[in-house]
Every structure is written in C-alpha cells, then in structure tokens.
C-alpha cells in the first residue's frame, strides 16, 4: 500500500537549503510564475562581482557568433556562459526549492521517514505541525492562507478510489504554478468519510512510532459519494508505461453483478508485446544494414542492397536492431550535413564566377554592342535560381569605335586613291564644271582640304563622345535603374559597371587594342589641355564643375575602381594601360592620383622597365595624391576619400605600401580570382567583404594587416607602444574584419586598458551583427567567422574577464573553449592570444576539464611556432620550453588528483 500514496518525483535540494515555513510579506510568493530563486552556488558566489554588463555581453556575443559558425561547439549554442545561467545541477536544486511548497513530503515515499524533533514529537502531533510540506495535503496553494488539520499517519491508507483521485490532483503533470489554483482542494478532513486504517509506515525510532491500526471497516455508498471528485475537474485515467493505440484500448466487459470487468492482464501484456514487435520489425525493414542481415539469412546476395558505407548486422535481436537504427540515423545526419556543406560551397563558387551572358544581336542595321545587365531587384530575390534571372539589355554608351575608325580609314583611302590617280587622258566632250576646276593645282588643293575636314570631323566626333548626335537617334535607349541593392563589392556588380562605362572592345587582337589605346590617349590629351586652358582664365578656387562634368568624372572613377577590383574579365597589362591613359582626362584629385599610382605599379612592375624608374613614377603620383588631399577642401564636390584611405595617403610612403607581396595580391584582386583568400599573410579577403568598397580601401586594409602581423610578432621581444596599434586601427575600414582583429590585439597587448578595449571590441561586433540582421545574405561576407576565429575571440574574452576580476566566470568560460586541431588558419593574432591566455590560466586551472583545455592550447601554441616560422631561434626555444613545462606540470597535477 505504500506505493499508492500520492507523491511528486522531484530532485531534493541540498541539506543546507531549508524550505521557508512562512513567506515574508515583502518577498515574492514562491507560487508566482517564473519566481525561480537564485539559489545556485555559482549565482550566489558571483552575484556581488557581476554587476557590470561585461559578462552578459561577452556570453551573448559568443552565443550569437557560434550560431552562425558551422560545426561550432554545442556548449556555446545550447548553454549560456553567463554566471546567472543555471547548469543541470543548479536547475535541479532550484526546481526542487520551487516545487517544495506544492509537493508532498518526500518522507511519504521513503522509508524510514525523517521527522524533525522540533516540528513533531509523535505521529499525533501532525495536527499542530506548521511544516507546509505536511500541511499541504488539501490544496497545493493553501499552505500560506489557511491552517489545515491533517489526519494522523495511520489514516493515509484510504480506499483505492480516493487514492486514485488524489494521484490525479497531485501528479507531476498537473503541478503548474499558472494552473494549479484552478483545481479544487480535496478535503481530507470531512467527518463523514470513514476510512479504513492500516499501519503503513515503518517506525524509525522511539520518537516516531505509529499508533495501533484500527479495525478495517467497509465504506458505505454515501461515503464514496462524498469523497468523489467534483464534476468540474476533468478526470483522466492514469497513464501506463506503454502507450496504447486506439485499437488496443482494454475492453470493459460487464460482470455478473453489473460492475465493469477489465480484460485480463495477460491479454493486455500480449497486445503490448505484439505491438512492440511489429514496430521493431518495421524498423528492421527500414534500415539497410538490417535488411542486408535478413537477406544473408535467406541466402540472397548483397549486390542490390545499398549499405552506404555501413556494415551489415550479424544478429537480428531487438538490441541490435535499435543499435543499428541509431547508427543509421547518425549516418544520415552526417551525410546530410556534408551535402549541405557541398551545396553551399558550390553555390558560393557559382555566385562568385557568375558572368552575365551577352545579349543576342539586335535586328537593327547599325552595329550595336549590347550587354546584359542583371536587374538588382531580381538578383536579390532570385539569387538562388540562376536560370530564372530576368535580364534586360541596354545599348552601349558609344557606337562600335573600332568599326567606325576602320570605316573612316577605308573611306579616306578610297578618296586618296581616287584623287591621287593622275592619268594623262584627254578630256573629251563638254563637262558641267568649268575646266579650270579640273586643273591639277585645283585638284590638289581640294584633296588637301577634304583630308583636313575628314580628320577634324573624326576627332570632333570621337573626343566629344557623340554628345551632339544623341538627339538624331531614332530609337531611344532603354532606361536602366541606377540604384542597385547588390553589394558594391560583388564581382557581378563590378563586371556590370565595367561593361557599362568602358569603351574597350572585347576583341583581343593587337590592332584593335592599338587603336583603342590611340583613342584613349587622344581623349586624355584633349581633356588635359581643356582643363589647363580653362585654368588660365579661371582660378582653381573659383572653378565650378557642371552636373554633366561631375557625372562623367564619377563614371570614370567607377570604371577605374571596377577594373582594379576584378571587373575586367580579360584584364592584362595593355588593357590596364588603356584605362590608365584615359584617367588623365579626369581633373586632378587625391583619389585619382592614388589610383594612378596603383595602375603604374601594376603595369610596369616585373617588366623590362627598370624598377628604379617604376618606383619614381609611383612615388610621383603618390606625392601628388598627398598634395591634392591637403587642398581637397577647394573641390568639395569631387569624391571624398574615406578616413582610412586618407590616413593611408598622409602617413605612409609609396615604397612601404607597394611591396612585392602587395603587388602580387593586387594582381590577384584585379584578375577576380579567390587566391587572395588562401594567402597566408592575408587576414581578410576583400573580394567578398561587402564593407570594402574601393581598391584604395583594399590597399589600406591589407597594409594594416601586414603592420598588425609584424607588430604582434615584435611584441614577443619588446614592449609595444599604444600609439603603434592606434595607427594601425586608423588604417582599417569601418566595420571590416581587420579592425575587429586590431581591437582584439589592443585588448591583449595592453592589460592596463582592458575595460576600455573590451568596450570597443563589444561595440565593433555589435555593429557588425546589426548589419547582419538587416540582410541575412551578408553574414558570411561581413562576419567572416570560422572555428579558428571563434577560438581566438573566445580566448580573448576569457582573458579580459580574468583581468577584470571575474575569476570564476572567466574560468568557466575558459573551460568551454574549443581548440581547433587544424593548423590551416593559424595567424599571428591567434598565436599571441592563445600564448597570453595559456600563461594566464595555466597556474590557476584546477579541474580536469580546465587542464584539458590548457593541454590542448599548449599543443596549439607549439604548432603555431612551427607554422609561423619564427626566425629568432632563442625565442622559439623559450616558447617551446614553456609549453613543455606546462605540460609536465599538468601531468603531475593529474597524478596527484588520481592518487587523492
């Protein structure tokens, strides 16, 4: 009968946590929804030291980034590292305290019972007890508002019907602080109820002995009715361990006395076994390895069975079937994840190398070059379905220059041959023109005048870009939306911009390129002379550009940026030279001069031109950019440089910026390949970074990355000044990944400014996550986060919290660090952060899990020393010996722990 007593199975709190007997007036009621007391040891120990939001912001940042990274540790995505978060043991103890006011005393379910001498002297003293766990038998919420006079212990042996009703009222499923007040109380003190009594509790000692059991009496019908459940309370039969299907519900058969008689227990168990065996057979037929085992038993071959890398089962018992089913589920999950990764890689590759196809030739008699421009809205919406992209063709800004030039040459050659063919034939008959006009002298003069007129008209037509003849075109150009929602650094967008503003022919013949270079040179000379002549009559301070001139200047700047950022699919030195020649038609500005320096370096480096001459030319354009930037306020309407680019031009020299390694990376960028993302010394890949908008910003970010790597390696042998890291931060584009890395380096290298540096790091990542929340497609291109960078950030935040005095929280965060096994993404930043964190946490780590992270981090540091190829042998030996000492100390500590 002891098992029939209603109870609630909850975990019991520690002995030190006593349940309050009376709620204070100003305290929150334990029955209120969500009132979970912070009784966990971690929360109580860190409550005084975690008043600042540093810990919460750090843990939230790690969880947000881990949810984006593939194969991230589950400890970061499923749990919070906040000191106020509950672990499993903390949650059990807290839920135990929370449910104690609603639950029956645990002593009713355990033998021997534990009664304190202060609250109960004998079993008869239950009536005067104030323990809410014992006085709550009537209603789960009535222990604070009313005093319940409970029966003695030997009166708990009630009839089976009453016990079943009480079990429904106080089962685990029905105890809910939001709904428990709706249930009526089961009044156990009704005097009309006559219960049969029996001794059900084994006496523990002399202080707690049950009274002699009374005689068994039979319940009258009236007593049964008085103890029944009210009709408003929904009655549900107690659930058995195995769930029955609707067809397997036990049948009720009327007995001889009219009372319902249940089906025999053996029949019910037989139905359970039959149903379970059928389900196991279905599971066996669904798993390939189990089907293969069944086929082998029948003597069939396994040629038609696709095991998918799984081994067939040897047995077909129930345990093997369940084990093989679990193995097959995990195999399918791994295969599904691998397929998702492959699909993502293929889609990224397709998006990167996608090139808009050329439009079909027009039916117009004129030779028109048409190019397909992908609508920005269609690209943003239907990016995944490439074949269904809506394409619109628009005519090129200029006619076919090469064909027009060749046609003019042929006409001139024909005229030259016609007038130059001086035959000695006589003139017979009369002619409409006077004879003196046909004299040799007159013919020579007319021929020379015609040649001069043709040349002048051709030059005027080419240099003015057909601006005077636009009104005579019969067919209007289709308007193309200038606004685009695509990323400015998208390779497709850059190619579209280059095709829109470039005058180059797609032919690769030498003659076409030569004529194109000649035309660009003439236009550049004409624009340069026009600007100089205008400057003679108007001072530079009073020079005002018209809207048309500004539009032409901006279009040309877009052309330069697009070609240097991979917009020209057939880029080579000659095509770069033609666009470089056309850049001289632009008014001088700091942006144009800096781009001309980049063009000069790319065109003439690693050629037959001496490197000294190339360096002088590059330095000339770079110094011109500095001069133009110093007086940039004169032409405020021209393009304004970003802050990082302006700092790069002002505070650096051309020889330092355009190193051989930098020139190689710029060539890779211009050729629109992904090799720059695989370069060992490149922290960011500007090809897919949507926040790097121009080649000058790419140059600044790569130069800052080189300076940061050099500074981090020098920090091992000398003390770094804070002005050096501030200079690097000033060269980084806003919200780019390089500025976040520079802020992490500042946080690690300068312990005295930990609080300010941590605020800057959290603010930088918050701004980046806000940008990602606006457009989900930019997560991979803006964050550029992976497991290695997540490890670097995790270690840096743990180190910062340790320096700020959050010892317990930092150790808890440190033990959840996932150290990557691969050495492919090791950078100087990850090496310095892991080395500093290792020296900080190795002396204070005590638990086995913390020591495991320390050991893995020591191995990571040793791997980084070999990967980065540190030139100083003494420094390398010192670092390796320190890692070995830490490892040997851990082995001693582990032995001490095991012996203890």
Curated annotation (Swiss-Prot):
This is Sterol regulatory element-binding protein 1. GO terms for molecular function: DNA-binding transcription activator activity; DNA-binding transcription activator activity, RNA polymerase II-specific; protein dimerization activity; RNA polymerase II cis-regulatory region sequence-specific DNA binding. Residues 1-442, 531-900 are cytoplasmic. Disruption phenotype: Cells fail to grow in the absence of oxygen or sterols. Residues 464-509 are lumenal. Pfam families: DUF2014 (PF09427), HLH (PF00010). The gene is sre1. SMART domains: HLH (SM00353). The keyword DNA damage does not apply. Residues 1-49, 206-263 are annotated as: Disordered. The chain crosses the membrane at residues 443-463, 510-530. Residues 1-440 are annotated as: Nuclear form of sre1. GO terms for cellular component: chromatin; cytoplasmic side of endoplasmic reticulum membrane; nucleus; SREBP-SCAP complex. One of its GO terms (biological process) is positive regulation of transcription by RNA polymerase II. The modification Phosphoserine is found at residues 898-899. Its main location: endoplasmic reticulum. Forms a tight complex with scp1, composed of 4 copies of scp1 and 4 copies of sre1, which protects sre1 precursor from degradation by the proteasome. It is found in: Endoplasmic reticulum membrane. Residues 260-332 form the bHLH domain. Induction: Proteolytic processing to mature form is induced by low oxygen or sterols. The processed form binds to its own promoter to promote positive feedback regulation and ensure maximal activation. It is a multi-pass membrane protein. Residues 1-16, 35-49 have a biased composition (Low complexity).
């Amino acid at each position: 009968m002891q098992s029939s007593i209603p109870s609630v199975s909850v975990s019991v709190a520690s002995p030190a946590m006593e349940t309050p007997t009376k709620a204070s007036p100003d305290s929150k009621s334990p029955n209120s929804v969500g009132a979970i007391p912070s009784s966990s040891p971690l929360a109580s120990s860190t409550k005084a030291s975690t008043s600042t939001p540093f810990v919460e912001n750090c843990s939230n940042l790690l969880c947000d980034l881990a949810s984006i990274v593939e194969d991230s540790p589950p400890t970061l995505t499923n749990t919070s590292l906040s000191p106020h978060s509950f672990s499993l043991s903390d949650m059990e103890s807290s839920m135990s305290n929370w449910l104690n006011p609603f639950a029956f005393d645990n002593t009713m379910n355990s033998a021997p019972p534990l009664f304190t001498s202060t609250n109960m002297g004998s079993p008869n003293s239950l009536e005067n007890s104030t323990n809410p766990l014992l006085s709550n038998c009537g209603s789960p919420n009535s222990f604070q508002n009313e005093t319940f006079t409970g029966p003695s212990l030997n009166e708990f042996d009630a009839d089976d019907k009453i016990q079943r009703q009480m079990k429904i009222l106080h089962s685990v499923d029905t105890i809910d602080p939001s709904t428990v007040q709706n249930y009526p109380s089961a009044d156990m003190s009704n005097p009309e109820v006559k219960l049969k009594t029996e001794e059900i509790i084994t006496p523990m000692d002399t202080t707690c002995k049950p009274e002699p059991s009374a005689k068994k009496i039979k319940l009258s019908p009236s007593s049964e009715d008085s103890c029944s459940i009210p009709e408003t309370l929904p009655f549900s039969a107690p659930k058995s361990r195995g769930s029955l299907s609707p067809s397997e519900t036990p049948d009720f058969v009327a007995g001889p006395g009219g009372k319902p008689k249940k089906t025999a227990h053996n029949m019910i168990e037989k139905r359970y076994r039959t149903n379970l065996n059928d389900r196991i057979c279905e599971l066996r037929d669904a798993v390939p390895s189990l089907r293969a085992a069944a086929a082998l038993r029948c003597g069939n071959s396994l040629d038609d069975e696709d095991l998918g890398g799984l081994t067939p089962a040897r047995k077909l018992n129930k345990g093997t079937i369940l084990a093989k089913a679990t193995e097959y589920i995990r195999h399918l999950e791994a295969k599904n994840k691998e397929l998702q990764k492959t699909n993502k890689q293929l889609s990224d590759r397709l998006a990167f190398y996608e090139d808009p196809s050329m439009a079909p030739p027009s039916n117009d008699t004129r030779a028109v070059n048409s190019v397909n421009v992908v609508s920005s809205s269609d690209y943003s919406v239907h990016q995944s379905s490439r074949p269904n992209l809506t394409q619109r063709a628009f005519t090129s800004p200029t006619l076919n220059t090469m064909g027009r030039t060749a046609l003019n040459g042929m006409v001139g050659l024909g005229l030259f041959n016609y007038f130059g063919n001086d035959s000695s034939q006589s003139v017979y008959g009369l002619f409409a023109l006077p004879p003196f006009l046909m004299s040799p002298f007159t013919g020579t003069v007319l021929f020379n005048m015609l040649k001069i007129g043709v040349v002048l008209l051709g030059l005027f037509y080419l240099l003015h870009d057909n601006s005077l003849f636009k009104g005579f075109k019969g067919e209007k150009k289709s308007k193309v939306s200038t606004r685009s929602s695509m990323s400015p650094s998208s390779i497709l967008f850059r190619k579209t911009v280059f095709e829109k503003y470039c005058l180059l022919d797609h032919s690769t013949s030498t003659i076409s390129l030569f004529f194109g270079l000649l035309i660009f040179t003439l236009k550049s000379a004409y624009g340069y002379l026009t600007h100089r002549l205008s400057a003679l009559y108007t001072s530079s301070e009073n020079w005002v550009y018209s809207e048309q001139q500004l539009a032409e200047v901006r279009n040309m700047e877009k052309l330069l940026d697009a070609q240097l950022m991979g917009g020209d699919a057939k880029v080579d030195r000659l095509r770069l030279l033609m666009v470089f020649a056309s850049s001289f038609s632009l008014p001088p500005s700091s942006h144009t001069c800096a781009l001309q320096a980049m063009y000069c370096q790319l065109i003439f480096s690693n050629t037959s031109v001496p490197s000294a001459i190339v360096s002088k030319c590059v330095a000339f354009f770079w110094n011109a950019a500095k001069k133009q930037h110093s007086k940039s306020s004169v032409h405020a309407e021209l393009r304004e440089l970003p802050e990082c680019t302006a700092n790069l031009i002002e505070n650096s020299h051309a020889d330092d910026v355009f190193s051989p390694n930098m020139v190689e990376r710029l060539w890779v960028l211009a050729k629109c390949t992904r090799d720059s993302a695989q370069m060992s010394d490149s922290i960011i890949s500007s090809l897919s970074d949507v926040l790097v908008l121009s080649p000058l910003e790419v140059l600044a970010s790569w130069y800052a990355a080189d300076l940061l790597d050099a500074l981090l390696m020098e920090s091992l042998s000398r003390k770094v000044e804070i002005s050096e890291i501030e200079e690097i931060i000033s060269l980084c584009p806003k919200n780019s990944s390089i500025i976040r890395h520079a802020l992490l380096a500042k946080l690690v290298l300068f312990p005295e400014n930990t609080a300010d540096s941590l605020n800057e790091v959290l603010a930088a990542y918050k701004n980046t996550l806000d940008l990602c929340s606006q457009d989900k497609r930019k997560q991979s291109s803006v964050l550029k986060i992976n497991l290695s960078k997540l490890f670097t950030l995790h270690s840096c935040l743990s180190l910062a919290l340790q320096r700020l005095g959050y010892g317990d929280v930092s150790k808890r965060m440190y033990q959840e660090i996932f150290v990557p096994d691969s050495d492919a993404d090791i950078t100087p930043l990850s090496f310095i952060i892991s080395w500093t964190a290792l020296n900080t946490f190795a002396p204070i780590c005590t638990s086995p899990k913390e020591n495991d992270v320390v050991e893995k981090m020591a191995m990571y540091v040793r791997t980084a020393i070999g990967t980065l190829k540190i030139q100083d042998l003494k420094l390398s030996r010192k670092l390796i010996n320190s890692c070995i000492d830490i490892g040997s100390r851990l082995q001693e500590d582990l032995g001490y722990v095991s012996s203890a």
